[in-house]
Every structure is written in C-alpha cells, then in structure tokens.
A protein has these predicted regions:
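Acidic, metal-coordinating catalytic cores used for nucleic-acid/nucleotide bond scission
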Residues: 2-12
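Phosphate- and divalent-cation-binding pockets in alpha/beta enzyme and binding domains
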Residues: 11-15, 95
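Short alpha-helix plus adjacent loop in nuclease-associated cores
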Residues: 17, 24-65, 114, 201-212
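Metal-dependent DNA phosphodiester-chemistry modules and their immediately adjacent helices/loops
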Residues: 46, 52-70, 219-233
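A short, charged helix-loop
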Residues: 52-79, 110-120
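Glycine-rich, often acidic, oxyanion-interacting loops/wings at catalytic, nucleic-acid
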Residues: 77-156
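Phosphate-backbone recognition surface of nucleic-acid-processing proteins
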Residues: 156-159, 165, 169-258
Length: 264
C-alpha cells in the first residue's frame, strides 16, 4: 500500500502495521505532485496513477520517506511544541512593549505619565499571559531533559561546539537512526543545508542552500553556529582557514555565509 507522505499518514501506517503480508510505503509528496503537475491536471485519480507508476517502475527506493517510530514522532513534536511557545512568548513581549511604549518617562521632567485603567488592564493581562507562557516553556524543557536523561546519543551530540540540550534533543529524534544516511552530505541535504546546483551542458552553477526538510532543526543548527561564532571565533579558522580571515569577518553578509557553512 502506497500513499503520499502528506498530513495524517501516520495513523494509516499504524493501522496497517499489524496486518500480515502488508507493506506500507510513504512517498515524497513534493516529488510525486511535481510529476502530476506537468500534465496540468491534479486530481485524486491522477495522484493514484502516479503512485502506482512509481511502485511498478521501481521508484520506491528513490521516493520513499523515512517512517519514524511513534516515540521519535512524539519527542520531535515536543521540540516543535516548545518552539511554538517560544514564538508565542516573543509575540507577547512585543505586545507589552507596544502598549507601554507611549507611557515612557518624560526626558525633561523625569515624570512618568499616568496610565488609564484600560491600559493597566491590558498590561497586566499580557504580563500574566507572558508569565504563564514562561511556565509552559519550562515544563516542556523539563520533559525534554527527562526524556534525554537516559539516552546515550544526546550527550554525544552535546559535545559538538554550539549544540546544547535543545538542539541535541531535536537532532536526536529527527534523525533517530544515523545508519539510514550514507554520509554527511546526505544528512546535510536532509535538513535543507545542501547546495542548490544547476547544470546544463558544460555550465555548472551552485547557488544557495535548498532549505528543504525540517525548518526547526535548520534554525537550531544556524543558532548553534551563531553562538560558536560569537563565543569561540578562534575555532572558525579550524573549519574555514581562508573564509575566517580577519579582514573578511568585517562584512556581515560574509559572516552569515560562514554561519550557514558552519551549520552544514
């Protein structure tokens, strides 16, 4: 049984798992959809025909996606849940600043303007929501620490410069099994850090990163690389001797390129 790896395919996989003589395959929806889009007609019937064609012509090894275990899915969803809470905390902080910005201290008299009851209510409500969000983030991080306490892989990931408890937890459960990657280039491409390439005849041009795969993991890797650039700049020359020259590091665009290269 084959289906596109779209939203909601995990329950189907779990339901078919106990059945004997049944093989379930989830195919990359981005690639199968691109095949159907070339005809200009996108229907469920055409999608089913494309999936059948892929299976009959031996395209399963090329288009099949990894099927993570239930525990790995739940752990990575916890990392996604924490990320959403962090974004919510940022929005609340911005809202508090927007409300209180007009009630700053007078630079000439040193007096603070009196806030109305409405503004006081909004500020208190936002601060209460912010405090509650902080507690939720703390609970999520406690769960992550508890789940990673007995895992042998997470401490090894944290030995990498720039990788902390949050990065290592997300990496651990998104990768799950490192043996499914042939080399580091395939792992980098899995997280969208591979280089775009365009070749036609004798021309071959490389561009930016592909930005496919997990956005969260790619963001955490870039943040870890930024932390390493800020706290351990002397280590950059170990990875990129020419790019990390002192004169080049003055260019912000150049520094951003080094950060992405370090994340790869």
């Amino acid at each position: 049984i084959a289906c596109e790896a779209a939203f909601g395919w995990f329950p189907l996989r779990d339901a078919l798992a106990p059945l004997p003589d049944t093989t379930f395959v989830a195919l990359d929806a981005r690639k199968t959809s691109s095949w159907a889009a070339t005809s200009g007609i996108k229907t469920d019937k055409v999608d089913a025909q494309v999936l059948c064609h892929v299976c009959l012509q031996g395209g399963i090894p090329r288009l099949a996606v990894h099927q993570p275990s239930r525990h790995a899915r739940e752990c990575f969803k916890l990392a996604l849940h924490r990320e959403q809470l962090v974004r919510q905390r940022t929005r609340l902080k911005n809202q508090v600043q927007a409300v209180t910005r007009e009630y700053g201290i007078n630079p000439y008299t040193g007096e603070a303007p009196k806030k109305s009851d409405l503004v006081t209510f909004m500020e208190a409500d936002l601060l209460e929501a912010l405090s509650y969000t902080e507690e939720r983030i703390k609970r999520a991080e406690d769960w992550m620490a508890c789940l990673g306490k007995d895992d042998p892989v997470i401490p090894l990931l944290q030995t990498i410069p720039g990788i902390g408890p949050i990065n290592s937890f997300a990496l651990r459960w998104k990768i799950e099994t490192i043996d499914r990657f042939e080399d580091s280039a395939h792992l980098s491409s899995y997280f969208g850090l591979g280089i775009r390439e365009c070749q036609s005849g004798g021309m071959r041009r490389k561009g930016k990163i592909t930005k496919t795969g997990s956005t969260l993991v790619r963001k955490l890797l870039v943040q870890g690389a930024q932390a390493m650039c800020a706290k351990r700049p002397e280590n950059l020359s170990l990875y990129f001797p020419a790019l990390a020259a002192r004169g080049n590091m003055r260019d912000r665009t150049h520094v951003n390129k080094i950060v992405v290269a370090l994340a790869r």
